[in-house]
């Protein structure tokens, strides 16, 4: 059973944003292209990850969380509000 689930913005190559389904289960972040997908596009172990909030006023997506894995890979996720980003950051901190 997921602890948190939502369609969020994911920053892709060349700064383009795509909306994808993110689910946190236990200590793993899963990213799916759509709700019908059975296999995740991305599976990120949250243990050992660092999470940082960044505000980007005047941009298309104004609230971002940058998740950096222990291996060094980074994932940038966009939110519609600061509160929404903070809610996700709290869950990530509990799971990491």
Regions found by a protein language model. Give the residues of each.
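Canonical pleckstrin homology
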Residues: 14-20, 51-96
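A short macromolecule-binding patch
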Residues: 44-45, 76
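Phosphoinositide-dependent membrane-docking surfaces
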Residues: 29, 45-56
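Polybasic phosphoinositide-binding surfaces of eukaryotic membrane-targeting domains
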Residues: 1-44, 88
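Residue-level detector of conserved, well-ordered beta-strand and adjacent loop positions
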Residues: 9, 47, 68
């Amino acid at each position: 059973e997921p602890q948190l689930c939502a369609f969020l913005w994911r920053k892709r190559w060349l700064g383009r944003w795509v909306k994808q389904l993110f689910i946190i289960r236990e200590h793993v972040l899963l990213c799916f292209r759509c709700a019908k997908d059975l296999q995740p596009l991305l599976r990120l172990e949250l243990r050992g990850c660092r999470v940082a909030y960044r505000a980007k006023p005047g941009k298309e997506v104004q609230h971002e969380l940058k998740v950096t894995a222990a291996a060094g890979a980074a994932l940038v996720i966009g939110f519609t509000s600061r509160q929404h980003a903070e809610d996700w950051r709290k869950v990530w901190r509990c799971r990491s």
